[in-house]
């Protein structure tokens, strides 16, 4: 399945720089001890911008929910249909979610509740993205 190549902006650059090093980092608020994704100018909870830093997390989570896209007419960049769309809840902070098509997991075979791990996939020479795969 073809993947979009992300273009980092000043706010997301630390995230994508870490992905290129095969690491997962998230913004962390020192004021309320919360992780957040996607990156924002201020904490989603306490609205502090001064206390935001980047924190490495272990990249483990669980599948919270899943659907199968069978006819994504509006999404022509995903020609391989049907495909999974799973919501992954991060173990390090259950309030942080990611979305993934779970490469390697066939449509309709997503084990909701299963453990997943972040994986890094090369989508162009020298260009990595983060994905989630069901843990072995």
Report the location of each language-model feature.
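A broadly conserved sequence feature marking short terminus-proximal activation segments
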Residues: 1-26, 133-135
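Cys/His-enriched microdomains
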Residues: 27-30, 41-44, 111
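Cys/His-coordinated zinc-binding microdomains
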Residues: 33, 47
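Residue-level marker of beta-strand positions
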Residues: 60-62, 115
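Short metal-coordination and nucleic-acid-contact micro-motifs, chiefly zinc-binding Cys/His arrays
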Residues: 22-25, 39, 57-59
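Short functional micro-motifs and their immediate structural scaffolds
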Residues: 37, 51-53
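Well-ordered alpha/beta subsegment
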Residues: 93, 98-136
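Glycine-rich active-site loops that engage anionic ligands at enzyme catalytic sites
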Residues: 63-103
């Amino acid at each position: 399945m073809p993947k979009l190549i992300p273009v980092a902006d000043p706010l997301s650059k630390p995230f994508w720089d870490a992905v290129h090093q095969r690491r997962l980092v998230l913004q962390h608020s020192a004021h309320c001890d919360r992780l957040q994704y996607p990156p924002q100018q201020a904490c989603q909870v306490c609205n502090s911008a001064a206390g935001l830093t980047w924190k490495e997390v272990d990249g483990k989570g669980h599948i919270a929910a899943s659907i199968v896209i069978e006819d994504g007419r509006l999404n022509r960049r995903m020609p391989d249909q049907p495909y999974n769309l799973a919501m992954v809840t991060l173990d390090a902070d259950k309030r942080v979610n990611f979305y993934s098509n779970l490469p390697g997991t066939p449509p309709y075979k997503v084990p909701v509740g299963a453990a997943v791990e972040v994986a890094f996939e090369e989508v162009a020479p020298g260009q990595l993205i983060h994905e989630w795969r069901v843990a072995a």
